[in-house]
Amino acid sequence: MKSLIRKCPRCHAYTMEEKCPKCGSDTYIAVPPRYSPVDRFRKYRIEELRGEIDGENSGDQI
């Protein structure tokens, strides 16, 4: 399995380890998902960005 660069959310350090060597917190993969022009989940990502899924922008406009 190939290794991807990881980032610590607490101290913002980049590493290849599962745990941050500086502060010991869990790290996450810092590489964004691959872009595809045929994106099956595009609709849901756009709705989430606009707040329509969570009910924040449910059509009650003034």
UniProtKB/Swiss-Prot annotation:
One of its GO terms (molecular function) is snoRNA binding. The keyword Signal does not apply. It comes from the Archaea. Keywords: Ribonucleoprotein, Ribosome biogenesis, rRNA processing. Pfam families: Nop10p. One of its GO terms (biological process) is pseudouridine synthesis. InterPro entries: H/ACA_rnp_Nop10, H/ACA_rnp_Nop10_sf, Nop10_arc-typ. One of its GO terms (cellular component) is ribonucleoprotein complex. Belongs to the NOP10 family. Involved in ribosome biogenesis; more specifically in 18S rRNA pseudouridylation and in cleavage of pre-rRNA. NCBIfam families: PRK13130.1. This is Ribosome biogenesis protein Nop10. The gene is nop10.
